Amino acid sequence: MDKHSENQVGITIRKLYKIFGPTPERHLDAVMNGMDKATLRDTQGHVLGLRDINLEIRPGEIQVVMGLSGSGKSTLIRHINRLIEPTAGEILIGGKNVLEMGARELRRFRSHSTAMVFQKFALFPHYTVLENAEYGLRVQGVSGK
C-alpha cells in the first residue's frame, strides 16, 4: 500500500443497522440499547439482520466477509450497493454517501463502480464460458477490441 492510499478511504460504513419487518424504525432504539435478536423476533415479530456495523476499507485493500450461514454476509454486501435499504447508518464509497444517491446516480454506481456475484448464480446454458464472461461488457456496449 503506498503512502497516498493510506490516507484515502474507499468504503466507510458507520453504525449500520438492518431490522426486517413491517415497522423496523419503531424498534431501532431498543436494538441500539441492547435488545437481542431473539427478543426482537419473539416479542415484536421482526428480524435483526445487521447490528452496529462499522468498517473502513482503503482503496486497493482486499477484505473477506466470512461467517456462518444466516449471519448477515449477503445482507451486508447488498447494503453496500443499496439492493437493501438500511434501517439506520451511513455507507460512503469514495467519500460519496450511497444512501443519498438518486435513481439515475445509483444505476450508474451499480453498473460502473460495484459488482456482486450471487451465491446461486445462473450461467446462460447456450453460451460458452467466454461468452458468459463477456456478457456484462456486451450489455454495457463495450466493444470486443
Residue spans for each PLM region:
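ABC-family P-loop ATPase nucleotide-binding domain
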Residues: M1-H46
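ABC ATPase NBD coupling module
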Residues: L40-Q44, L99-A115, V139, G144
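The feature captures the beta-strand-to-loop junction immediately N-terminal to the Walker
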Residues: M66-L68
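Helix-to-loop junction immediately C-terminal to a conserved catalytic motif
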Residues: N81
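Conserved ABC transporter NBD signature motif
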Residues: G89-N97
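Short helical segment in ABC ATPase nucleotide-binding domains corresponding to the A-loop/adjacent helical element
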Residues: L130-R138
